[in-house]
């Protein structure tokens, strides 16, 4: 252990702070690989010098971009500021402000709001930090996540990258199928996030490799942050709403994961086994109690072989949580269930096994959780009825698209259920008739789905009639809840992670989604960067412009949008297509294009001769010139 610790500290001291997003991503990979190597060899990493990485300019820009992409970025904290306020400051001011926050971190109080809990009278408290504190938290998450991802239990799925709820359900089904165990402990921790002990959490962070005491002090200050109009100091819990809170909750619950899995699933044996099933076969000859864990945030199940063992797990877990983590199991919601006789509820799904042609004699049956599905369809029916009667046909088309998005969202979440189509049919007809009545004033009709013009990928597969309205000689229809089929979930591969090249390739093979390219800040000259950082080109060249011009260059694939030539040999220039837009829109990526200097001059100067350009480029130049009217603004 001492050898691992010395090696880890030396490794940490070799890390240089990143100067670009490309370097930041490489550094994340290094942090993951180092932590994984030490962990797999039986130790724990011991990393220092993390604050310099968190407060680096490249990390701050990435953090702001991540937050800006979420709808919550326009939700103000106690200081009434939103992300828009930061984006409109100069680049240098934003960087200095966040770096200053890291050096002298004093978090502002949290603004508390309460949201409805589905199907419950009580409300869920959400703590909203200020934008400044959110940026600091996101900078920390970017650096800490790869360190913890290398050490987390392989089958915890909540709040982790490249993982989702269907994977957790699929893991449970596979365990039952392979082991033949049918007794489930349905775990429910009472107010888990509100009762996390700060001292235990900080010790766990230190244990998992965070040896930079400055970082631990900042996290401690975050945890202790008071709530406006409620308390000066928060003595326990992580604020639900903080960007780093889900990661910290996983760190805390990893204590439970480690305790459960070391008793059976990853128990060390005197002699190594070449295959896991041989190890479990040997363990079954001992007095140990079998148990396999699947966890998603604070929802978890333990799969075991008999009722007595299930009750034993429940009893011992209650003692462990109380004594080691200061948490308690909810006695009403923590159940032991034989899934051959009764459904369990897990992550919004219901799961049991029924007799069938399988090696162990049972096959899985999964359905959407009935109460939750009913509430969701009730809400959609209510939303359809509430569509204003004064809506024009254009507005009604937008309303139909919004409702269809809600319906397809429900289908997407539940299509991993084997009986999804049967379950959806029970609620589908009601929504159809509600939708048809709402279209009466637009002379709505029942039209075959494959004859409507919206959602073609879905509707072209079905001839069933759906409520539709005519709009400009085409039919737009409300989609149907039963337009769904079971889709098998691909089991999670432990090697799939955002922090290795092989892991990213596995993610692409599973989802066909490519990783977004890193910002190309290094493509802009240092002279240009200095001028824009210190606001020498006016208020339009604010932080948002500096950040988004690099993302626009990515979108343009390093090619000039006028002549199509490569922008590698010379510095690219960012041009605002419409410089007359308001400040909150003028620097968005969709209003920025990348050009050669010569092409930029041709666009901005109406007297510039364009005969040297080919016909296609000339047409583009003329088009961009027209959008500059009434002002010709030179943008760099």
Residue ranges and their predicted role:
Residues 1-19, 23-30, 34-36, 307, ...:
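Active-site and adjacent loop segments of nucleotide-processing enzymes
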Residues 567, 583-590, 601-636:
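Polybasic, low-complexity binding patches
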Residues 1-92:
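Non-catalytic, polymerase-adjacent accessory regions of viral genome-replication enzymes
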Residues 126-141, 149-152, 156, 165-166, ...:
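Duplex nucleic acid-engaging cores and interfaces of nucleic-acid transaction enzymes
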Residues 85-86, 130, 302-306:
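Short beta-strand-to-loop capping motifs
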Residues 67, 97-121, 131, 135-143, ...:
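Reverse-transcriptase-like RNA-dependent polymerase core
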Residues 94, 109, 154-155, 160-163, ...:
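Conserved polymerase palm-domain catalytic core
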Residues 188, 564-597, 607-608:
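Histidine-centered nuclease catalytic patch
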């Amino acid at each position: 252990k001492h050898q691992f610790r010395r090696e880890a500290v030396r490794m940490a001291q070799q890390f240089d702070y990143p100067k670009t997003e490309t370097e930041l991503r490489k550094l994340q990979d290094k942090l993951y690989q180092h932590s994984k190597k030490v962990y797999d060899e039986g130790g724990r990493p011991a990393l220092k010098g993390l604050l310099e990485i968190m407060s680096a300019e490249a990390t701050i820009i990435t953090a702001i971009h991540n937050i800006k992409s979420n709808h919550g970025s326009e939700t103000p904290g106690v200081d009434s500021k939103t992300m828009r306020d930061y984006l409109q400051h100069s680049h240098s001011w934003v960087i200095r402000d966040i770096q200053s926050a890291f050096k002298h971190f004093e978090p502002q109080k949290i603004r508390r709001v309460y949201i409805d809990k589905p199907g419950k009278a009580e409300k869920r408290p959400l703590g909203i930090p200020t934008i400044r504190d959110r940026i600091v938290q996101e900078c920390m998450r970017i650096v800490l996540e790869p360190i913890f991802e290398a050490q987390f239990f392989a089958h915890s799925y909540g709040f982790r990258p490249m993982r989702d709820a269907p994977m957790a359900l699929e893991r449970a089904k596979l365990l039952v199928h392979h082991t033949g165990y049918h007794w489930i402990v349905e775990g429910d921790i009472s107010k888990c996030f509100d009762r996390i002990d700060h001292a235990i959490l900080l010790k766990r962070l230190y244990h998992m490799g965070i040896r930079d005491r400055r970082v631990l002090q900042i996290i401690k200050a975050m945890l202790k942050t008071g709530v406006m109009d409620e308390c000066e100091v928060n003595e326990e819990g992580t604020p639900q709403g903080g960007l780093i809170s889900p990661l910290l909750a996983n760190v805390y619950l990893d204590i439970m994961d480690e305790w459960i899995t070391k008793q059976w699933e990853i128990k060390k044996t005197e002699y190594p086994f070449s295959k896991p099933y041989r190890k479990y076969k040997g363990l079954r000859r001992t007095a140990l109690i079998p148990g396999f864990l699947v966890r998603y945030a604070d929802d978890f199940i333990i799969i075991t072989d008999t009722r007595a063992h299930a009750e034993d797990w429940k009893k011992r877990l209650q003692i462990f949580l109380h004594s080691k983590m200061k948490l308690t199991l909810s006695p009403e919601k923590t159940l032991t269930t034989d899934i051959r006789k009764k459904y369990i509820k897990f992550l919004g799904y219901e799961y049991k096994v029924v007799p069938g042609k399988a090696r162990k004699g049972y096959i899985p049956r999964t359905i959407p959780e009935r109460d939750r599905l009913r509430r969701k369809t009730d809400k959609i029916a209510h939303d359809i009825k509430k569509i204003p009667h004064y809506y024009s046909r254009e507005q009604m088309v937008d309303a139909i698209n919004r409702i269809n998005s809600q319906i397809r969202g429900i289908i997407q979440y539940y299509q991993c259920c084997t009986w999804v189509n049967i379950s959806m049919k029970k609620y589908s007809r009601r929504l159809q008739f509600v939708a048809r009545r709402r279209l009466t004033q637009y002379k709505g009709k029942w039209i075959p789905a494959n004859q409507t013009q919206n959602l073609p990928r879905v509707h072209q597969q079905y001839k069933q009639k759906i409520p539709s309205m005519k709009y400009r000689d085409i039919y737009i229809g409300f989609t149907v809840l039963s337009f769904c089929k079971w889709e098998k979930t691909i089991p999670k591969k432990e090697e799939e992670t955002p922090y290795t090249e092989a892991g990213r390739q596995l993610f692409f093979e599973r989802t066909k989604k490519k990783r977004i390219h890193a910002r190309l800040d290094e493509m802009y000259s240092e002279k240009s960067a200095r001028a824009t950082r210190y606001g020498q080109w006016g208020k339009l060249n604010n932080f948002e412009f500096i950040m988004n011009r690099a993302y626009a260059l990515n979108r343009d694939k390093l090619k000039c949008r006028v002549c199509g030539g490569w922008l590698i040999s010379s510095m690219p220039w960012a041009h605002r297509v419409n410089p007359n837009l308001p400040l909150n829109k003028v620097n968005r990526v969709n209003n920025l294009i990348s050009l050669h200097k010569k092409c930029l001059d041709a666009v901005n100067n109406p007297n510039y001769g364009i005969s040297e350009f080919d016909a296609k480029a000339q047409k583009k130049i003329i088009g961009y010139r027209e959008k500059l009217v009434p002002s010709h603004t030179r943008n760099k």
